[in-house]
Amino acid sequence: MDFLVLIKYILLGLLQGFTEPIPVSSSGHLVLAQHFLGLNIEGFSFELLMNAGSLIAVLLVYKNDIFRLAVNGLSYVTTKNEKGKADFRFIIYLIIATIPAGVIGVLFDDEISAFFKDGVRITAVTLLITGLALFLIRNLRGRKSDGEIRLRDAVIIGFSQMVALVPGISRSGATIVPAMALGLKSETALRFSFLLYIPVSLGGTILSITDIFHDPRLGELFLPYLFAFIASVIATYFSLRWFMNIMAKGNLVYFSIYCFVIGIAVLIFA
């Protein structure tokens, strides 16, 4: 095994993990990084593993919220305990918001990938779009907390998440931007976005897990995949913790500037 190849895969894992929580598109950065590192990773096995690593990190960060929602939601279903009503409704809204992207992703994933096959240029353009969206909401300060989310909010956020099926569009950006535009507090928008990420990522992992075992290069690249997976878990965990602080301070404009700079640079030099 070439040591340099191993290092490149670890760098990809760190990059994917770091960019997964923040609104700059992890998949887009993977495309760009593969281009500039001279790697040609075919199929979806590697990206699937990286997403699974990020999923584990998100579960660790939000384990208390998940436990509270599960306990209170079950309590409301079984005993109609009013204290659990808000959490039960929150769960229902998460399910509703999952449906649009889930259905379209399952039915048209191959068609979407084929349509946007010029990965590097598409990524550059979508980074510019993301930068513009983040710039437009830079000064928004919502007032809605978890218990004040409504059905309309869940539906709009769910359909907005479909935009993230386009390569290079950030999933967190595609959900946080409309959530804040609908008046959700930044911490509520962030929590809803990443709790929504869990069923989406879990469903995608389950549906595509056979791709990993049918990857003809799995034996050859087992160690690079493994180290990249571990790197993805660690990087996602710390990046998400950091992004929580950024959201609390309302400094999304920095991500907007970053997306503009990288998008323009890629269009010029790639």
UniProtKB/Swiss-Prot annotation:
It is found in: Cell membrane. It comes from the Bacteria. One of its GO terms (biological process) is peptidoglycan biosynthetic process. Keywords: Antibiotic resistance, Cell membrane, Cell shape, Cell wall biogenesis/degradation, Hydrolase, Membrane, Peptidoglycan synthesis, Transmembrane, Transmembrane helix. GO terms for molecular function: undecaprenyl-diphosphatase activity. It catalyses: di-trans,octa-cis-undecaprenyl diphosphate + H2O = di-trans,octa-cis-undecaprenyl phosphate + phosphate + H(+). It is a multi-pass membrane protein. GO terms for cellular component: plasma membrane. The chain crosses the membrane at residues 41-61, 88-108, 117-137, 192-212, 218-238, 250-270. Its EC number is 3.6.1.27. The keyword Transferase does not apply. Catalyzes the dephosphorylation of undecaprenyl diphosphate (UPP). Confers resistance to bacitracin. Bacitracin is thought to be involved in the inhibition of peptidoglycan synthesis by sequestering undecaprenyl diphosphate, thereby reducing the pool of lipid carrier available. Belongs to the UppP family. This is Undecaprenyl-diphosphatase 1. It comes from Bacillus licheniformis (strain ATCC 14580 / DSM 13 / JCM 2505 / CCUG 7422 / NBRC 12200 / NCIMB 9375 / NCTC 10341 / NRRL NRS-1264 / Gibson 46). The lineage of its organism: Bacteria, Bacillati, Bacillota, Bacilli, Bacillales.
